[in-house]
Amino acid sequence: MLATNDIIIRPLENNDLEFLFLLENDKSIWSVSGTTKPFSLEQLSNYITHAKVDIAIAGQFRFVIDLNGKAIGCIDLYDYNFKKQNAGVGVVILKQYRRKGFAKHSLALLVKYAWEKLNLKQLHSIILSSNKASLALFYSLGFEMTHKNNYVLNK
């Protein structure tokens, strides 16, 4: 568990099922998440069960962004590569909690975790040029564009 102010980023828990169902089935974020069809409660329950696998084995890890005990978003490490010491990062916040600084605090926590605990040297993210809020978020924490829609932060 990683914390700052009122924000905690923590692993998925079994009681996050309804939150995850709401988040993953929000069609407004499908264009940035790669989702093409709705998830069932059973699929997401299975996902939560298997999401507890170590990042070194699974190659990814999802954290829940928790505000005073309420799940408001997720922040993920994906495409984890131990040898290259890098990983992808993605963040999504429920609509009613956006533009309040929660994504920035969460991303800053995740970057610190990636540098200090996972010993990563690079994080990357794929961001659509139309996603101005995400561009501003990642730029504000030092990510730089390396290719069209690809942003990198080096340690």
Report residues per predicted region.
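Conserved GNAT-fold acetyl-CoA-binding loop/helix
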Residues: S28-H50
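Acyl-donor (CoA/ACP) binding surface of acyl/acetyltransferases
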Residues: M1-L17, D26, V64-K155
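Sparse recognition of residues in long alpha-helices and their boundaries
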Residues: T36-K37, Q60, N154
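Alpha-helix initiation/capping motif
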Residues: K37-S40, D54, F82, I127
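Conserved catalytic core of Hanks-type protein kinase domains
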Residues: L22-L23
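Alpha-helical elements of Rossmann-like donor-binding domains used by nucleotide-donor carbohydrate transfer enzymes
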Residues: F19, Q43-N46, H50, H105, ...
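Short acidic-aromatic low-complexity motifs
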Residues: N15-E18, A56-A58
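A short helix-loop-beta-strand connector motif used in the catalytic cores of GNAT acetyltransferases and
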Residues: A51-V64
